């Protein structure tokens, strides 16, 4: 019997959310992306759109212009340079977009309730915890309860990658046959991945540690 498509996924076009979309594709009715003024938004969104179309999933892109206009973060077009080097708290703290996941999950909750969908998937993972407060289990748990209590149909948030690493995610993706050349990580948002910013370094390490050949085209 075919499973009911009762879920929404927040998908950026990066490795993690694309992997989750393929893993949960049997239940996903809607893929939701946000244009919030980040340096890499355009590159990410093109891949979010590609994979949604490939899976036959409706795809919405909702603009969140106010984030780029009023929030402070070097990840935004309005911010400073993207730091290079390792993906760790000290190096990447300038790229925190305040309460980004909270805002996106709130919008996703309203949309899920409007569509009669029962579940929201989000692909935060263990490696994000030290850097981004709204990727931690200590945020996801109460946000899940708030959304459940605040929606008439008791919408649930599911974040199945919260306690696993990006290497683990890469292995899942490989088992699903995902071509990671068709995903975007680089925060600089150029024509090619820069290869030296924190997210590029994390991407390289995850694929290497998973034993997966890196198909990414890097600058130089």
UniProtKB/Swiss-Prot annotation:
Its cofactor is Zn(2+). One of its GO terms (biological process) is queuosine biosynthetic process. Pfam families: QueC (PF06508). Its EC number is 6.3.4.20. Pathway: Purine metabolism; 7-cyano-7-deazaguanine biosynthesis. Belongs to the QueC family. The keyword S-adenosyl-L-methionine does not apply. Keywords: ATP-binding, Ligase, Metal-binding, Nucleotide-binding, Queuosine biosynthesis, Zinc. Transmembrane segments: none annotated. CDD domains: QueC-like. Coiled coil: none annotated. The keyword Metal-binding applies. It comes from the Bacteria. This is 7-cyano-7-deazaguanine synthase. It catalyses: 7-carboxy-7-deazaguanine + NH4(+) + ATP = 7-cyano-7-deazaguanine + ADP + phosphate + H2O + H(+). Binds 1 zinc ion per subunit. Disulfide bonds: none annotated. ATP binds at residues 11-21. Catalyzes the ATP-dependent conversion of 7-carboxy-7-deazaguanine (CDG) to 7-cyano-7-deazaguanine (preQ(0)). It is an enzyme of class 6 (ligase). InterPro entries: QueC (IPR018317), Rossmann-like_a/b/a_fold (IPR014729). GO terms for molecular function: ATP binding; ligase activity, forming carbon-nitrogen bonds; zinc ion binding. HAMAP family: QueC. Zn(2+) binds at residues 186, 194, 197, 200.
């Amino acid at each position: 019997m075919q499973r009911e498509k009762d879920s929404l996924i927040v998908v950026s076009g990066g490795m993690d959310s694309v992997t989750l979309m393929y893993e949960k594709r049997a239940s996903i009715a809607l893929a939701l992306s946000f244009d919030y003024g980040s340096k890499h938004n355009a590159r990410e969104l093109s891949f979010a759109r590609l994979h949604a179309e490939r899976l036959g999933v409706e795809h919405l892109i909702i603009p969140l212009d106010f984030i780029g206009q009023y929030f402070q973060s070097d990840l935004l077009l309005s911010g400073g340079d993207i730091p290079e080097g390792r993906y760790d708290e000290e190096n990447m703290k300038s790229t925190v977009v305040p309460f980004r996941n909270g805002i996106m999950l709130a919008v996703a909750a309203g949309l899920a309730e409007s569509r009669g969908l029962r579940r929201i998937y989000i692909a935060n993972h263990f490696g994000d915890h030290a850097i981004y407060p709204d990727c931690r289990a200590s945020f996801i748990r109460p946000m899940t309860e708030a959304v459940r209590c605040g929606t008439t149909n008791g919408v649930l948030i599911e974040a199945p990658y919260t306690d696993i690493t990006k290497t683990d995610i890469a292995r899942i993706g490989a088992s699903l046959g995902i071509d990671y050349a068709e995903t975007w990580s680089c925060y600089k948002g150029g024509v090619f991945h820069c290869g030296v910013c924190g997210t590029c370094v994390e991407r390289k390490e995850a694929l290497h540690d998973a034993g997966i050949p890196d198909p990414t085209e890097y600058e130089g």
